[in-house]
């Protein structure tokens, strides 16, 4: 029974640690978990991303997360209109442990991007989602189901909870400031991109438990984030420092680091016929009460596609069970560039 409880605790730990919210380490490829205001905040009019993560591989039946997201901006090409809009859609699913406890969530976001000047925008966004949480009861084993000789699944488990799947509605909102510049007139001048913002998830504090009699609500999650892309003394090298601070109930997390981007081929700033080819790499760190993980990352971008690979190296006390094996993460993104050229100062602006 003790071993069973330990396995259940290990399965639930990554979920309970931050209130069932998913965690991707490639935050530049999973913006929907940071701020719904990121919908439409990119150089292009359409992008689609898929993410996959396998966490704590040394533990039996590790914690796996899958997601896909899509966002589309419209009304951007009208130079006389200071405001345009964007829609975002995300779907994610996570599965953990032998009992396959999992959460499936589908969300839709709507953002308004207000032009402050040629290069700066203020963004406000709302997000609504619908989720379902369940587990595979057939895989659960209880001490009362051992006959003294072997395990007998026909014996009652003696538990009052039915563990039936439950659903919930969720709301989030966010604001952000986005600066993006593409200087066509000076060839070697580095374009820059910066985002700062604040978001709040679980505004309605949805009921979140298998037992309907329990008053268990998901606490709001507050996120403050900032990132910027700076040029260097080398015209084809860029520096990208970034930081996210998350607070949810009594839990908090700081995720920060920096990436370096090497431009192997610059995208055309006027015609758009030549696509960007770049290699990006760096290291981030996740800190709670202690240093939790170190995350090396690498991205390869070519012809509107970007492939990302990272690995969470666990350095917290859990490393005794995980053998420093945190989680492998993969992402693939496609961005469709803007069809209009001269009216958009962010077209082919260098971004991460």
Residue ranges with predicted function:
Residues 195-203, 214-352:
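Outer membrane beta-barrel transmembrane domains
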């Amino acid at each position: 029974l003790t071993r069973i409880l330990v396995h259940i605790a290990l399965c639930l730990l990554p979920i309970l640690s931050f209130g069932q919210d998913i965690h991707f380490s490639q935050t530049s490829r999973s913006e929907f978990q940071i701020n719904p205001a990121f919908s439409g905040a990119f150089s292009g009019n359409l992008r689609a991303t898929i993410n996959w993560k396998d966490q704590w591989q040394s533990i039996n039946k590790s914690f796996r997360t899958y997601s896909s997201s899509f966002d589309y901006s419209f009304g951007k090409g009208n130079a006389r209109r200071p405001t345009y809009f964007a829609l975002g859609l995300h779907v994610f699913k996570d599965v953990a442990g032998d009992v396959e406890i999992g959460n499936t969530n589908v969300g839709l976001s709507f953002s308004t991007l207000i032009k402050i000047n040629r290069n700066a925008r203020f963004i406000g966004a709302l997000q609504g989602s619908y989720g379902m949480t369940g587990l595979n009861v057939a895989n659960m084993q209880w001490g009362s189901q051992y006959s003294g000789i072997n395990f007998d699944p026909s014996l009652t488990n003696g538990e009052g909870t039915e563990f039936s799947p439950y659903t919930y509605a969720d709301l989030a909102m966010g604001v952000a400031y986005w600066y993006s510049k593409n200087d066509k007139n000076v060839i070697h001048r580095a374009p820059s991109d910066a985002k700062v913002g604040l978001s709040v998830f679980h505004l309605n504090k949805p009921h979140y438990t298998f037992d309907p009699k329990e008053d268990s609500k998901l606490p709001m999650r507050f996120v403050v984030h900032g990132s910027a892309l700076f040029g260097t003394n080398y015209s084809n090298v860029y520096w990208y420092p970034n930081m996210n601070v998350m607070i949810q109930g009594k839990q908090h997390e700081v995720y920060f680091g920096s990436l370096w981007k090497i431009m192997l081929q610059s995208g055309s700033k006027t015609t758009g016929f030549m696509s960007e080819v770049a290699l990006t790499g760096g290291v981030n760190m996740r800190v709670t009460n202690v240093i939790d993980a170190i995350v090396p990352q690498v991205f390869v971008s070519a012809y509107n596609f970007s492939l990302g690979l990272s690995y969470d190296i666990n350095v917290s006390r859990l490393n005794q069970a995980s053998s420093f094996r945190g989680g492998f993460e993969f992402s693939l993104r496609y961005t469709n560039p803007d069809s209009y050229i001269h009216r958009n100062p962010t077209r082919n602006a260098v971004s991460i």
